[in-house]
C-alpha cells in the first residue's frame, strides 16, 4: 500500500509541472520499477499507459497481508514485456496477472520472450544459473515494442 501511495504522490506531483501534457502521461519500469508502473495503473490514476520490463506482478497488499481490491476497472493501457523463464515472475505469475487485468477490464498485452530470463535488458546481467541474463533480441525487440505502444496511445 505504501508503495502505491508513493507512486500516486509522485504522479500527482509530476502532473503539476507546466511542461507536462496531462493527457499524455505514461510510466515505464524495469524489475521493481515495473511493479511500480503496474501498481500505478492498478490505483485508478488517470495515466494513459504503463510498460513493465521484466517486472514483478504481485498486487499491492495491506499490512495485514490481505490483497487490496484497488480499482474495479483499469483504464490505462498496459504493455508487459516478459522473459518467460524469469524466476522472479514465473509463467504462473504471468497468468495470474493476465487474469487480474482481464477481471478489471484493462486494455493489456503481454509479450513473452522464450528462453529469456530476468534482467534481459541489462547488458551486464550474467547470472544465467540464477535466471538473470541479458538477451540482445529481447532487449531490442522490447524497446521497439514500447516505442510503438506509446506512439499508438499518444
Q: Can you say where each PLM-predicted feature lies in the sequence?
A:
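N-terminal cap/leader regions of alpha/beta-hydrolase-fold enzymes
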Residues: 1-154
Amino acid at each position: 500500500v505504501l508503495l502505491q501511495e508513493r507512486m500516486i504522490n509522485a504522479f500527482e506531483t509530476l502532473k503539476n509541472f507546466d511542461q507536462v501534457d496531462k493527457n499524455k502521461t505514461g510510466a515505464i519500469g524495469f524489475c521493481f520499477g515495473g511493479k511500480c508502473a503496474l501498481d500505478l495503473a492498478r490505483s485508478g490514476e488517470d495515466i494513459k499507459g504503463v510498460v513493465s520490463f521484466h517486472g514483478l506482478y504481485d498486487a499491492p497488499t495491506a499490512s495485514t497481508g490481505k490483497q487490496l481490491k484497488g480499482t474495479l476497472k483499469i483504464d490505462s493501457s498496459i504493455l508487459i514485456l516478459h522473459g518467460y523463464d524469469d524466476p522472479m515472475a514465473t509463467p504462473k505469475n504471468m497468468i495470474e496477472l493476465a487474469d487480474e487485468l482481464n477481471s478489471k477490464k484493462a486494455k493489456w498485452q503481454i509479450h513473452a520472450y522464450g528462453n529469456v530470463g530476468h534482467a534481459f535488458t541489462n547488458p551486464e546481467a550474467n547470472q544465467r544459473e540464477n535466471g538473470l541474463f541479458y538477451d540482445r533480441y529481447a532487449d531490442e525487440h522490447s524497446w521497439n515494442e514500447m516505442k510503438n505502444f506509446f506512439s499508438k496511445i499518444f
